[in-house]
UniProtKB/Swiss-Prot annotation:
GO biological process: translation
MF term (GO), any: structural constituent of ribosome
Pfam families (UniProt xref): Ribosomal_S2
Protein's organism: Sodalis glossinidius (strain morsitans)
Coiled-coil annotated spans: none
Protein name: Small ribosomal subunit protein uS2
Annotated InterPro entries: Ribosomal_uS2 (IPR001865), Ribosomal_uS2_bac/mit/plastid (IPR005706), Ribosomal_uS2_CS (IPR018130), Ribosomal_uS2_flav_dom_sf (IPR023591)
GO terms under cellular component: cytosolic small ribosomal subunit
Keyword Zinc: no
Similarity annotation: Belongs to the universal ribosomal protein uS2 family.
CDD domains for the chain: RPS2 (cd01425)
UniProt entry keywords in alphabetical sequence: Ribonucleoprotein, Ribosomal protein
Record-linked NCBIfam families: rpsB_bact (TIGR01011)
């Protein structure tokens, strides 16, 4: 399982919070102090909290659990997609559509439409249409791929959410809370930690910090999944004997 050290976090700037005037008092237990009117996060808390979160995500992955990575702001968007793809998991990296979890039935219909359009774009159907109709369907396909492409193969609700920026993704967190899905989240000094089951206090804006979190989570999930695959192989080997 991947673990992250204090040095890794310092180098990535995980300890830099937001300006003191934007703070959320609920984050007080995780704040070391302030420097130049910027809150400094106490990494002596962040390191064990993050490593505990990684251990739990490893367990979920080893039980074939589905993990949904959520990060829709510009600084996180591309990295979230890459991290989720690298460990065969799922992601939302553009806009979170209200009801994405709580109204899964409707989302499933949109995913079906997305897959139908994908098939049409590949089997020559688009070429038989008028230019205008083909353009309209291409636009619809692009729009659906943008919003649902990262969850089109999820096949049901996820077993956990890993969120970059609890404040920005509060709608996703509320939906997960309503459904009892555990939430792992990077929570900066301006954010409300309520509703986050595994709080990871840290900088949620710096690209280096975001990459550090995502790389560690993706590595942990991959290892958890390979444990599961190794156990499956062992079981089938025993059965064959």
């Amino acid at each position: 399982m991947a673990t992250v050290s204090m040095r890794d976090m310092l180098q990535a700037g995980v300890h830099f919070g937001h300006q003191t005037r934007y703070w959320n008092p609920k984050m007080k237990p995780f704040i070391f102090g302030a420097r130049n009117k910027v809150h400094i996060i106490n990494l002596e808390q962040t390191v064990p909290l993050f490593n505990d979160a990684l251990a739990e995500l490893n367990k979920i992955a080893s039980r074939k659990g589905k993990i949904l990575f959520v990060g829709t702001k510009r600084a996180a968007s591309e990295a979230v997609k890459e991290a989720a793809n690298s460990c065969d998991q799922f992601f939302v990296n553009h806009r979170w559509l209200g009801g994405m979890l709580t109204n899964w039935k409707t989302v499933r219909q949109s995913i079906k439409r997305l897959k139908d359009l994908e098939t049409q774009s590949q089997d020559g159907t688009f070429e038989k249409l008028t230019k205008k109709e083909a353009l309209m369907r291409t636009r619809e396909l692009d729009k659906l791929e943008n919003s649902l492409g990262g969850i089109k193969d999820m096949g049901g609700l996820p077993d956990a959410l890993f969120v970059i920026d609890a404040e920005h993704e509060h709608i996703a967190i509320n939906e997960a809370n309503n459904l009892g899905i555990p939430v792992f989240a990077i929570v900066d000094t301006n954010s409300d930690p309520d509703g986050v089951d595994f709080i990871i206090p840290g900088n949620d804006d710096a690209i280096r910090a975001i990459n550090l979190y995502l790389t560690a989570v993706a590595t942990t999930v991959r290892k958890g999944r390979s444990q599961d695959l190794a156990e499956q192989a062992e079981e089938s080997f025993v059965e064959a004997e």
